[in-house]
Each structure stands twice: as C-alpha cells, then as structure tokens.
Amino acid sequence: LRTGKRMPTKVSEVVIYFKRQPHNLFGDSFKNLPPNKLVIRLQPDEGVEITVMNKVPGLTSSGSMDLQKSKLNLSFSEAFADERIPDAYEKLLLEVMLGNQALFVRRDEIEQAWTWVDSILEAWKQSSEPPEPYQAGTWGPVDSIGLLARENRSWYESKTGKKK
C-alpha cells in the first residue's frame, strides 16, 4: 500500500500482481517473466486493465517462440464516450440532496477511525525513527524503493491520473 500527499499524479488505483506459476510453461529461456497484473482504476479515469504475458502467434525460423506483454483495457471514458460520466463529488452531492446518507460516515465511525489513527500517532511518538519525508512531486521516500527491492519487487507507478 502506498499513499501520500503531493505525489506526481492524483490517482487512486488497486494493483494486484498475480503469483508466478510454479511450472514455467515457456522453458528456461523465459525464467524471469514479469507477473501478470490487474489494475483497477478508481479515479480519475475509472476502468480496469489486465496485463499478461502471452505467446506471439507463429514460430520463428529456429522453432522457438517469442513472448510479449499484452494489455486488455476497459476505460469507462472511452467505452462510454457519448455519455457524461459524473465526477465522484457530483454523485456524492446528489445522494445527500436525495437524503441518502449511505455514502457518508457516521459520527461513531469517525470516532472509531480516530482511535485507530491515534494508536499510529502514539507509536510514532514512541519510535526513535520518525516518518521519512520525501520531495513533493515524487513517488515517496527513496528508501521505499529499497524496502521492496529486498523482496525482489518494485512499486507500480501509475501512468494515468491528473498531473499536479
């Protein structure tokens, strides 16, 4: 989970990396294939994208095969180009004007959330290491890259979203 303020783009996405298969169907020459992934874009351009490695149709002259990364992309703004898609706040304001409070949190929920946040703030006060700052307009602290690199992983950096 990565979140922050003043990052390069304003975007909310859920990125799911699928586990690598225990048996490599493509042979030893394709040992380090990137994992397939599913990106669910919540805002600003709602949609779903799945990226998979697949075999290029046909054979090479040597009888080997080639693989390439392919994307299947559903962008609501493209799929419904003739429709006006309301902004998230428009939907929220319409619901409150209609008297539907289902999209809003109650006071007891807010108090419970602050109980959780207060425990985090208290743990930070007890810690000898403060949260690591980062330069505005970047994807976060430099050390966050090393945090994932220790597990041979890397952060997903969104290509969508509104530039700040």
Predicted regions located by residue number:
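Secretory/organelle targeting and membrane-embedding segments
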Residues: 1-164
